[in-house]
Amino acid sequence: MTKGDAFRLQRGDAQLTGRLHEQALNGPLRIEEHGRPQANLSYAGGLLHGLSQTFHPNGRLSAQLPYQNDRLEGVASFYSTEGQLLRSATYRKGLLQGEAVTYFPDGTVAERELYNNGVREGLLQRFHPNGKLALKAQYLNGQLLDPGQRYAEDGRPLNAAGKPVSRLKWWWTNGAEE
């Protein structure tokens, strides 16, 4: 192939289509199988660069991945086979950085966590499917600082035995719900 050549590779029902520049992948690269997209990748000088997408076997989007110089950079999003957002996470220089959020199939938040240079750092929150807080914990340098506080589906804290505190005690310390 010569400089800037487009190419198409076929093996059985799989097909790879892209472009080379000075013997390195450059520009969009498309992978298909059985006529359905498997991935749309973006290259610059042989490195992943730009927005790449992967697809589920049913053709729906599986992930959107922003790359810079072969490393994840920005918000990556991951989807179910039905198309619902399952997780979004921010990356910097290929490492998790900032907030990562995981979702239940109905779209409500299941978990929020914070990262610093790829290590869990700060507040971790997990939620019940009804949206109420299930767990609140703190991390420092990837280490859990304490067992955290767990909560029942109605919002009451759980005691050390895993039982919800009495409503009277909960209301007394937190104020009655209206």
Report residues per predicted region.
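Periodic aromatic/glycine/histidine/acidic cluster detector
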Residues: 1-80, 84-103, 108-116, 120-126, ...
